[in-house]
A protein has these predicted regions:
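Short N-terminal secondary-structure initiator segments
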Residues: 1-13, 58-75, 103-120, 194
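Catalytic core of membrane glycerolipid acyltransferases/transacylases, capturing the structured
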Residues: 37-97, 123-136
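Short amphipathic alpha-helical segments and helix-helix/interface helices
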Residues: 31-32, 55, 78-82, 103, ...
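A broad, low-specificity signal marking well-ordered, structured residues that form hydrophobic/aromatic
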Residues: 23, 41, 65, 114, ...
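Solvent-exposed, flexible loop/coil residues
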Residues: 13-18, 23, 27-29, 52, ...
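Membrane-anchoring hydrophobic helices of lipid-metabolizing enzymes
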Residues: 1-45, 78-83, 89
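Non-catalytic C-terminal accessory region of glycerolipid acyltransferases
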Residues: 35, 60, 96-224
């Protein structure tokens, strides 16, 4: 946890060449395949490892990158987060602007990579799906799946492995190029399953402090 905090802060000052040396992609061609298919990419992300470093992907792909984020009430920390995530020319979209922005991009013919932190806990009143996550049933975000189907995007999960202190390797796993062919919530369930596998391999690199299970006692009867 301490390493992740230090690495997040270091994101502000680390050089591009040093970041490329420390955060490598083993199969960036998975993203290139979707770009060549003339589709946008839905990158389903999680609070695992130094996830803030994923933004260096912009230096390896052709599509522009957009990160979905929730505005932080503390203005200082909000500016800090925006500064970190906007490095390497990544654009930021607040969660409230997401649907309208992505739909407008589709209408304008813009192809992009959209990063969604899909392991966060949604508001209970806007929950559509519950899923066992680390043996506890919780509400799960379905926005990435919904938009990928509506806007015909390729969907990708990425697995980050810590090689040693301050060094990572990321491997992409394409979930689908044709998201509309999947049943409701099937893509979301696949993401959760892949994430569980990743956590089980090295649980110490998951952000356990972000209240992922805060609604565990509110499971509706229909989902029990």
């Amino acid at each position: 946890m301490c390493d992740m905090l230090i690495e997040s802060i270091k994101s502000i000052s680390i050089s591009e060449s040093e970041m490329k040396r420390r955060f490598k992609f083993t199969n960036i061609e998975e993203i290139h395949k979707i770009e060549k298919a003339n589709k946008s990419v839905m990158l389903m992300c999680a609070h695992y490892g130094s996830w803030e470093w994923i933004f260096i992907i912009q230096k390896h792909v052709n599509h522009n990158g957009y990160a979905i984020y929730k505005r932080i009430e503390n203005k200082y920390f909000d500016r800090l987060v925006r500064k970190i995530r906007a490095r390497y020319n990544t654009y930021l979209i607040t969660n409230k602007e997401t649907m309208s922005t992505l739909r407008q991009h589709k209408a304008d013919g813009i192809k992009a990579i959209y990063g969604f932190l899909s392991d966060q806990s949604p508001k209970i009143e806007s929950t559509y799906h519950w899923k066992e996550f680390m043996n506890i049933k919780v509400p799960v975000h379905t926005g990435a799946e919904k938009l990928s189907k509506e806007l015909d995007m390729g969907v990708v999960f990425f697995k980050t492995k810590k090689v040693k202190r301050g060094y990572y390797e990321t491997t992409f796993k394409t979930i689908t190029l044709n998201s509309s062919e999947y049943d409701d919530y099937q893509i979301t369930d696949m993401f959760i399953s892949y994430l569980e596998e990743l956590i089980n391999e090295a649980p110490e690199y998951y952000l356990w402090t972000h209240k992922r299970w805060k609604h565990k006692d509110k499971v509706p009867k229909d989902f029990q």
